[in-house]
């Protein structure tokens, strides 16, 4: 008995052989298959199994003899139809007694190859069984678990030059080096003789030579004979295999071509269908063996399924409409690829002949319709169900991004990703530990997209961010969801607008002064009409702890000044040490030993001061606890004291600002005088600063005397809880501490001043200062607020000065101001304060793991006309802040300004904004609001009094600043750690705006073009940044980052990337499936990874992209524009804030969701 259908076109994407009349006649004769068939009459040599499977394809796997299989006669009939390219006619009789599937015992399997076409097929002898033993079942399960070993082979599609009679066969270099024996390059030219055996054990001899320009591997002598003997044409494929015995094997795979006209003597396809069905029905009725022929290249799919595979697929999966799945397909040159699809229906393929059949009863839709022709019906054992839906972007409930190691796949976060989002990687899915099966049903892509759009807002805001709100300082926030919070913010915004609170009016309306005083005083939420029981606040220890940082508004002025004075002394010493160490590198080598004793003395003095501060801190904490209890007892009396508290705060802020400016100028004088060489050009500047210093000292003494006379009666009469006299030594010690604190912040900020910058603060009138929620941040020229560089990249960017008119003087020197060094308004008649330019190399790098966020705002009428900003804060423009996942430049001047300008909710609500959920955000100093008597809680319970960087989740590493501020001092003013760690970086991003801003949701993006484009000034150029971690992107997966310094070569990098994205083995060169690794260098050029030397690659790489074969093909067609190859359904990157629907991207956020690689640096 001969074989059937060995050369007909198979289903796409696999190719099949050409059809000949002789082969068609053999296939027709093989249709009449009965019981007890014996196979071919002539004795044929054994077929090499490795070569047979290589020619059959990577997806073909035959069950072993003696195992249980499930035979589908419906699939067998489809093989005949595919071979004849003709469907079953209506007059073919049906067999009602023939079930749709037969459980059979596979007696033997014989491999065959057509002697004329070399097409492979298999002969199987089956016997239906009603019961089976354990041995057959175990053998079937064992065969399912055992994988066929990977053979060394390469496959090439022949070109026209390869099949020409006068040419040779060009072998790819890597294939020749891997499969062929090595050449002797001492010969000229290098050449050798190769022998290869085909499926019929015929030996073919070729001459392998390395020649040409450029040089290449060629098979010359003997190749033309092989092409003519096998009747090969362009489009056919040849396969070279090296078996276990290191012998070369040679096979062919013919291209899919239209069949020629069939002779009239050949049996019709209907007869073939009848013969197949009749043989199966007879065997099922008598339990007798029967023989079938399986042509893997002609059959659309396997119709003899291992019993264990069938059981696992049918009973291990819960199939439902909308379920997502993967399916493996063969690609060109024996490659494989998984395609994603969705189950759209479950119905019978042929409800008339095969009712309730499981053969291809699943209707599916494919995600990529243009990737190749695929069937719209599949069987359940062909697919791999995915246990979760496909989100365009997952909900942003993950924590901050951290440096990842090579073994990150075993970490807790990676396991969470694999369990929650298996659709992100091609190899990630949820499987049952026993059956290794996906078990959870899903929905279709469109349904899940609609569900995500409708429910993501409420789910993310109410379910997750409500947890973050519980960690804030005020206990009332525990009962507020995100939606309620947004409504209250909008309500407050409308209320302020109704009361004529405007930023651009010269003066505030008189009717809103009580509201302003209320905002400045920072009264807790329960005093504003919100239902909260005072008893709960008194008896709840956690609430008392959360209110600890904000209770300092009860401290007298003497204590605040004492804290500032002590801080100034501490930082003065530290600044001198930093200046000595920075100037040491500029002086000759002989002067270096002279500086060492000075540094040692400064360190000793600093240690003594830290010990004294620790003792003072303990005493101060006791006093704060007493004051806190007094505050709780006087809650009912507090509304009557609002006006006095507001007046006290205005005067207190005035004193703080003057003292800070005075100390800053003194430190600048000392730093200039301590320099070894003072140029003649700097002498006039020093003299001018000395004059200003004398004026400031005189004004400060006068203002302090006046303010103390005004404040003491108010404190003694209106605030009984604050007039408790402290011992004189106790008052003096905190006063010294306050001076030291401010000096430390002033000089530390100077250490971060970039080169060629100077401070020019033009003061306004000498009225008391009233700060707003925006005055804690420096005015900038729309400077990007983040950096991805540990160097001083951001420091070199100059900021615009704050210009104002004084009624007693004219405007002077309009040079640029360093970041956060200039306050928005100065409440005294100071003329100007200038800072000496300092080279950045003299500044110590103290800020390697601190995030910088600056709210950019501008004065509307800078330097024009006379304005009074006492009760009219300057208008501000809103610019979204962003943070990156790497180290950034920190301007310590931010801390300087925050110390002197505590935030308030003055006539505007706090505006929150999205921040990237994977961003590492740190706080510069959490004690900014605790020194000057400002309640840190706004009307809604948010810590309003914090500085810019205090609003974020983590603090500076204590180890970096042990020599600057003691741990006890820092902890006394720090937000409780449990509350601080729970603040969501996606909810709080340090963004503030004007009161007329539209605010719809706490998690929404402000996309008002008119508001964002309010300024007519051109945007600043983006900053150049350097990365310590490199971003990696792959389609369908979230972006990752890796540390290039951990690898020593390309092989380690590829292995790590394969593990990171669960594509082990697919990035190897021997796979030849088209995967490419490309990267963008510092010149924004797209290059193939692996061409440059490793050291040069590490120095210039900016981001890496893993491209699939389809993306590589798209790049070849559309040009090398990597930015346009990101699909619209790209999974959202960890650095885009978790918002897949954002219409725009910050220029420096590095967000891949906007579909452009131009943003990646």
Swiss-Prot record:
Keyword tags: Auxin signaling pathway, DNA-binding, Nucleus, Transcription, Transcription regulation
Residue spans crossing the bilayer: none
Annotated protein name in UniProt: Auxin response factor 19
Domain-related comment: Interactions between auxin response factors (ARFs) and Aux/IAA proteins occur through their C-terminal dimerization domains III and IV.
A GO molecular-function descriptor: DNA binding
Chief subcellular location: nucleus
Family membership noted in the UniProt record: Belongs to the ARF family.
Entry GO terms, CC: nucleus
Residue segments, region Disordered: 1-20, 573-598
Coiled-coil zones: none
Disulfide-linked positions: none
Annotated localization: Nucleus
Segments forming domain PB1: 1027-1111
DNA-binding region: 154-256
SMART domains, alphabetized: B3
Subunit structure and binding partners: Homodimers and heterodimers.
Function noted in UniProt: Auxin response factors (ARFs) are transcriptional factors that bind specifically to the DNA sequence 5'-TGTCTC-3' found in the auxin-responsive promoter elements (AuxREs).
Organism, scientific name: Oryza sativa subsp. japonica (Rice)
One example of a Gene Ontology biological process annotation: auxin-activated signaling pathway
InterPro entries named in the record: ARF_dom, ARF_plant, AUX/IAA_dom, B3_DNA-bd, DNA-bd_pseudobarrel_sf, PB1-like
